[in-house]
Amino acid sequence: MIWVSLDEPRRALPNIHEFGNDEWVWVNCGPYEWNAHSSRQLENFTDFGHFPWVHPGLLGDIKRPVVPAYEVRTDGHVVKYDIVRPEAPNTDDFPVFANASTQAPMRTSHYEVHTPFTLLLHLGWGDKEGMVYFFVSQPVDEEHSRGFLIIGRNYNYDQPDSVLQEFEDVIFNQDKTIVESQLPKKVPYDITRELHM
């Protein structure tokens, strides 16, 4: 992934302090080509309420679908929020998360939404193990986007990259079907132009 500024940058790039740390390994996933605007791709990545319904047994637990309360705050141009929420236990096919609990595991997520169409997500499970998602959606045009994802973790050092890549391919394909059906293709600034259920 290459960032280019044709003029003086308006904002700094997101600070990912785990980059360069030898205890972290990094996996490139995607790219993910969608027939949807980048705003939809990013919106989907920040919406954890759909996990139990769209990704049951992978990201969400259908027996614990309620989204706990959380607070959204801004820090300059960055939107931040933290949430502790139910997570599905690891599966035999995709043992990608560091949750030790096989019964009702919980996950702490720290979200940072940056402009343009960029997300930095830190995951934790209460111990030293952690995971970092760095997602950027490239607008191709008003109705198409290309998502790039880099994931870092400080555990599962011997696990082949393909396990995490295949997991993300499954997740993104499940989301793609739904997001590509949403109208308008671009997230409207006027919330009355959409029906939220």
Listing of model-derived features with the role each one plays in the protein:
Residues 1-3:
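Active-site-proximal cofactor/substrate-binding loop regions of enzyme domains
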Residues 9-197:
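C-terminal catalytic domain of Rieske-type non-heme iron oxygenases
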